[in-house]
Amino acid sequence: MNYDVIVIGGGHAGIEASLASARMGVKTLLITILAEQIGASSCNPAIGGLAKGHLVREVDALGGEMGLCTDATGIQFRTLNASKGPAVRGSRAQIDMDEYRIYMRNVVLNTENLDVKQEIADGLIVEEGEVKGVTTQLGNRYTASKVIITAGTFLNGLIHIGDKKQTAGRQGEFASVELAEYLKGLGLNIGRLKTGTCARIDAKSVDTSVMEVQPGDTPPPPFSFRTDKSTFNPKQLPCYVAYTNERTHEIIESNFYRAPMFSGQIEGVGPRYCPSIEDKINRFRDRPRHQIFVEPQTIDETEYYINGMSTSLPIDVQLEMVRSVEGMKNAKIVRYGYAIEYDYVDPTELKHTLETKKIKGLYTAGQINGTTGYEEAAAQGLMAGINAALSIQGKEALILRRDEAYIGVLIDDLVTKGTKEPYRMFTSRAEYRLLLREDNADMRLSKYGKELGLLDDAYIAKFEEKQKNIEEALNYLQENYVTPTKEFLAKLEAIGAVKINDRTCWIDVIGRGDFNRDKLVSLLPEFDKYDDEVMGQILVEAKYSRYIEKQQMQIDQMKDMLKIKIPEDFTYKNVSGLSNEIVEKLEKANPTTLFAASEISGVTPAALEIIHVYIKMSQKGKI
């Protein structure tokens, strides 16, 4: 059976990869261990969060499915950091995990050019360093010139609960053992990581009346740019905030010797920013309590996910520690928490397209690349699917820059720096985060979605109208000035805006004050024609215009720098400030330009700047 692209794994990365490829007109096959588990969320019942919300918005702006599915199945919507600047705000939604899975499975099974096979892939067909297809345990051979592996935690997955171990990719599901061994045989650098999840509690056994209530936002902010805000009003459920206490800590600490992560049973490195409860108690012994979030898993509110209590402690300890929390003294555990170890591919083995350097046509995306999180997985899956399809079509790859998208930051970090622990996205990882806001993801990326054919005509028309209105308004604010007449100063005083002393550009008037829609319209009534979405963009762009200009200048300078040629006789070991590792890599690769040097794994922007300075000094004869 012949295909153009084969995707192995039906999780968040595999869904976006297979949908993107198929929607671009490429014949695609998705191989998954259990068809009913397509779109299953292995851990928390939520999408988004700080920086993660940016990724979901970017996936959506490019034509991915995650944002639409979240809006269709969400049971609580919030904007995190709402009181802070727009660059660090993050959208987050609680999802109905059952409905999310059903939605995604239905979309996948009803997409043209996309077939689904419930099988276990056990190897690849590789000839002369080029992938030709996939083999399965049932003896089937599926041929394709592009294969995308999105195996999540299933590669050599090993679950730990106390001293008990079980080979599995997720609780109750087979691990992918043969494929993991096959990848090692290809010479790929394979490592071992660990993650975990918490116990799920029978909701009727929890007393939420003694906990802090955490409601959703009103009105609820949708994720997708394609969702109609005027009609978006889903039923929202509250989450609850509870706390561990000294008794909880005593129970956990007295059982450290039974914890797989302390006994030496677990070898893989766990996520730094999502530690298990036993790790938190061990690392932060001076803290009297830790915050936990009690989150509904479905709209039926039958089970609660205890966010903040990920654990692999034995089941008797899990029950005792859960019942020590106020409001949970009668808690009944439906599913026990566990840790899982799994294989991952060193992401420095990859190109920026997510194609492996050693095997032509083989791509990897998601947790297999060392990341953690549904959102990071979806972003990689989308880009792998897009680039595999573009390669089939003989077109140029789509590589998003660091100044263009958080997706660009994510992939660039992975393929140039690599990772020894599960990688999570943060806004602090982006150098140009004022340009990479959630609210302007469509302005940044929907042009690519349009070119790729991943966005429908109705959305494109709406997007282009929005883009036109924003440009029109900003051009007016940049090109027109106002003088400090008595009448105008009175208007500024009336709305509490900063007064001006000289003839001032409108964009600077807004940039100096805390403007909202009403204040701006009181000064410029003609702006009342813009809807709230457009007005929001106008206000942010105006307020931060000078900072945005500065960041854009830095980006332009970087682009110019990367064009600079490196002299053939340039000696890297004479450059002070470069590590031995970077020197070795540069000497081996012998790049001809700074851009070529930037593509080398481990060569940082700081290293490029140092080399640039030395090139300029050598040209001036100063060294």
UniProtKB/Swiss-Prot annotation:
Q: List the disulfide bonds.
A: none
One GO biological process this protein is involved in is: tRNA wobble uridine modification
Say if the entry is tagged with keyword Metal-binding: no
Q: Which InterPro entries match?
A: FAD/NAD-bd_sf, GIDA_C_N, MnmG, MnmG-rel, MnmG-rel_CS, MnmG_C, MnmG_C_subdom, MnmG_C_subdom_sf
* Residues annotated to bind FAD: G9, G10, G11, H12, A13, G14
Pfam families referenced in this protein's UniProt entry, alphabetically: GIDA, GIDA_C_1st, SAM_GIDA_C
PROSITE patterns, A to Z: GIDA_1, GIDA_2
Q: Which domain of life is it from?
A: Bacteria
What's its job? NAD-binding protein involved in the addition of a carboxymethylaminomethyl (cmnm) group at the wobble position (U34) of certain tRNAs, forming tRNA-cmnm(5)s(2)U34.
On subunit structure and binding partners, the annotation says: Homodimer. Heterotetramer of two MnmE and two MnmG subunits.
- Protein name, please? tRNA uridine 5-carboxymethylaminomethyl modification enzyme MnmG
Q: What is the lineage of its organism?
A: Bacteria, Pseudomonadati, Campylobacterota, Epsilonproteobacteria, Campylobacterales
The encoding gene: mnmG
